[in-house]
Amino acid sequence: KTLGDEFYEQLCSMLVFDALIYNEDRHFGNFGLLRNNHTGEIIAPAPIFDNGLSLFNFAMPDDFKNLSAYAKTRSNPYRISYEDVCKEVMGAKQKAQLRRIVDFKFTRHPSLNLPEQRLTAIEKQLGERTRELLSTPVQRSAKRKNEPER
């Protein structure tokens, strides 16, 4: 929080996104900050990167028959449930971001796709997961400018 409200909001959004896509590899070495090359001043959070261990990349074809059950077996490196993380970081901004993707569908490429059954199963699970995360109570509110710390 010492870097400011916008940094904190973006960190919270990253953690909620990780919960949405079941990112199994978010750790302290794969998110960062952008700095001014001349002054070293921190200017912004880095864009989200290193999401390769998500969207059920380890799932076998049989796992897609009941992806909801398989999803419950996935976790982050710290073994803290995605739901518990979201309970701590969910705010109005994250809820608004989730509402924008509730009906997400992958854009199909003419020739470079995962199998259609896999894409459809992931889309369905993401929709269910989005609705589930939207039911997470907002535990914090964004501080208004010039509002004193409590």
Language model regions located:
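Anionic ligand-binding catalytic core segments
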Residues: K1-N23, F28, G32-R150
